[in-house]
Structure formats: structure tokens, C-alpha cells
Regions:
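Extracellular/periplasmic, surface-exposed regions of secreted and cell-surface proteins
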Residues: 1-116, 252, 256-336
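Active/binding-pocket-proximal capping segment
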Residues: 26-31, 40-42, 199-203, 210-214
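Conserved small-residue
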Residues: 70-174, 214, 225-226, 231-238
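Conserved SET/PR-domain catalytic core that frames the SAM/AdoMet-binding pocket
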Residues: 89, 166, 176-189, 270-275
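Glycine-rich, aromatic-lined ligand/substrate-binding cores of catalytic
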Residues: 173-206
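Active-site-adjacent bridging/hinge elements
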Residues: 35-39, 155-162, 242-251
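Extracytoplasmic gating/loop element in the C-terminal half of outer-membrane beta-barrel translocons
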Residues: 200-292
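Short, glycine/acidic-rich beta->alpha junctions
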Residues: 1-4, 57-61, 163, 172-180
Length: 336
């Protein structure tokens, strides 16, 4: 593999070093790593050898802005960090641009291909007027109604290529965009406080059919998990429910689609700490050089549109990772 990187940066400090700024932009080109190789006749009876011909390009930036100052007995500071990147496939040996989870020339890394949805089928007449037999044989009210994008009267994958994807399109991108962090701190007469916030500004996510945390039903009873959010499910008594008709034996309603594409952006109060440093008049009496008491909280709060049972920081396709816990702690820093 050959990697060439062009990087441009600037660092500056102003206002007697109270404000500092750092910015880096990069363009990274990776060449000569393995792809699946050219197609060979089936008569050969073996898969083609991999060849080092693939090429990608990644562009991104990192920005850091900091401010610190003191006003009499009060000192404070703030540091903001923002980064972003986007990757493209420049070259890959996929001349027909198949969509079988392989790259193709011009592809944006993290693309989510899926169906656009009309909603859930309302009645038998609507089911009868829509041909989704390619995806599954039987459909009923409460099932997902996929949209006929190419106007051929049936829902399918076409030739499963970029040029003929059937009724699919790029519906989102799961690359975390605009990752950020903000640190705030202050100190006044022995009291101190600091808080660290971090998150992702933009990200789309489509949970797989194996995600019982998101779907509730995951193809079989022993892997299914039913939470309060899953009670908002279609039924004859709840025709406007969010989740589709319930099944244990099919994933036809859980295909990548716009209805259940999730906004996975978030902001989390990752750490909050409050402290107090004992005055010297007290530490001298107890023979300490310095003593500081503090209380600390990890993962205090998370702001996201994802269901509460899914942690956006450690998200995975099947969403079976246990969320990060909120932890409290107290302690002391003592110097003898």
C-alpha cells in the first residue's frame, strides 16, 4: 500500500496568548491495496486472485480553538475541537458497479443504499395494488409499503448495480461527520469546576434486522427483546403505530429504508467534575502540602434522537452493545 498525504496547517496565538488556534487540512490518497480482482470465467472453478489496484481519497480537517483568561480571583478557560473527513473510492475493480457490499468507482464511503417508503400498508386494497413479491411472497396491512422509484410497477433491486439499482437509492451515510469536543473549566478561591462535552454533528444509521434492541422482534423468539418503545407498533387498534406489523419469521419490513433510517448525531456530557482545594492555613495544621476534594460524574447526560436503550457513542449494526453507564465518584488529591 502506498499512502501520499498533503497537509496544510496554521497555528497562531493572540491577545497575549489568551486565544490560540490550530487548523489542519489534509488530503490523503491511498493506492495499491487489494481489491477482489478481475472477473474470470466460471469454467476456471476458482475465485480470481486479489490484486493491488484499488485507490481511495480522504479529505478532512481538524480545528482547535482555545481561550483562557483571569479576572481578579476568577480564572477560566475553554477549548473547542472540531474534526471532519469524507472518503471517496477513486478506483476499484468493479466495472459493472455491482452493489453487493463492494466498492465502486466514485463511491462515497459510508453510503447507505435503501428503499424509500410510502409508510405502512393501510388496508388490503393498498396491498393488492402494490407488487412487492420480489422481496417477499405475502404482504398484509401494517407491513412496510416501499416506493416504486423507477415506475415499473414492481419493487425490486433491478440489476443490482449503481446504474440500475431498481427501487433503491442512496438514503444516507453512516460516516460520523463533524465530531466535536468542548472543555470548559473555571476556578475561584479554591473552588474549581470542569466539564467535557463531546459528540457527532451528523450521522445516519440503519439498524440491521438482527438488532433486537431497535426492532424488538429479531427473527426468532429467543433473540427478541421487548421494551416500552416497541409498544408503539402497528395493529388494528393502533394503525398509526411507528413499528410495522410484528413477525418472528421474516425480516421483510426491516430492509434498509427511509422510514427507519435513524439520525445518530448526539451530544454527551462526558465528564463533570467539581472540586475544592483546602486553604493553606488548614493544610499546614494537618501536615499536608496540598489537599483537594472532588466529586466526579461520567456520562452524565446524552442528547440524541435515538431510543434511550441505544448508546450513540458505541453504536453497532445489531445494537446489542450494552450502553455506557453513568458513574459517580468522590475522591481526594493529597500531596504530603
Amino acid at each position: 500500500i502506498t499512502v501520499n498525504t498533503l497537509s496544510l496547517g496554521v497555528d497562531m496565538a493572540m491577545f497575549n496568548n489568551r486565544l490560540d488556534l490550530s487548523f489542519d487540512w489534509y488530503n490523503r490518497r491511498a493506492k495499491d491495496f487489494a481489491d477482489f480482482g478481475a472477473s474470470v470465467p466460471a469454467l476456471l472453478g476458482a475465485n480470481p486472485p486479489r490484486r493491488n489496484t484499488a485507490e481511495t481519497e480522504t479529505k478532512g480537517f481538524e480545528l482547535t480553538v482555545g481561550w483562557k483568561d483571569r479576572i481578579n480571583d476568577f480564572s477560566y478557560g475553554a477549548t473547542f475541537v472540531l474534526s471532519d473527513y469524507i472518503g471517496k473510492v477513486v478506483k476499484y475493480d468493479n466495472p459493472t458497479k455491482l452493489l453487493n457490499n463492494v466498492w465502486y468507482d466514485g463511491m462515497t464511503m459510508g453510503e447507505i443504499w435503501g428503499y424509500e417508503t410510502e409508510g405502512l400498508f393501510k388496508d388490503e386494497a393498498e396491498v393488492a395494488a402494490t407488487d412487492q413479491s420480489y422481496l417477499y411472497a405475502n404482504w398484509y396491512p401494517g407491513d412496510v409499503h416501499y416506493k416504486d422509484l423507477n415506475g415499473d410497477g414492481k419493487i425490486n433491486v433491478g440489476n443490482n448495480t449503481v446504474d440500475d439499482p431498481g427501487d433503491r437509492k442512496v438514503i444516507g451515510n453512516n460516516t460520523p461527520r463533524f465530531s466535536f469536543g468542548l472543555t470548559l473549566n473555571a476556578e475561584w478561591r479554591g473552588f474549581d469546576a470542569s466539564v467535557f462535552l463531546q459528540g457527532v454533528g451528523k450521522r445516519d444509521y440503519m439498524f440491521s434486522s438482527a438488532s433486537n434492541y431497535f426492532w424488538g422482534f429479531a427473527g426468532n423468539q429467543e433473540h427478541s427483546t421487548y421494551y416500552t418503545i416497541h409498544t408503539d407498533r402497528w395493529s388494528e387498534d393502533n394503525p398509526d403505530g411507528y413499528y410495522p406489523r410484528a413477525y418472528f419469521n421474516t425480516t421483510k419490513n426491516q430492509l434498509p429504508q427511509t422510514r427507519y433510517l435513524q439520525n445518530a448525531s448526539y451530544m454527551r456530557i462526558k465528564n463533570l467534575q467539581l472540586g475544592y482545594t483546602l486553604p493553606k492555613t488548614i493544610t499546614d495544621k494537618i501536615k499536608f502540602q496540598r489537599a483537594r476534594l472532588f466529586i466526579n460524574v461520567e456520562n452524565l447526560a446524552t442528547f440524541t434522537s435515538l431510543p434511550d436503550i441505544i448508546d450513540p457513542e458505541i453504536i453497532s449494526p445489531d445494537a446489542k452493545i450494552y450502553p455506557l453507564r453513568r458513574t459517580w465518584g468522590v475522591g481526594a488529591n493529597i500531596t504530603f
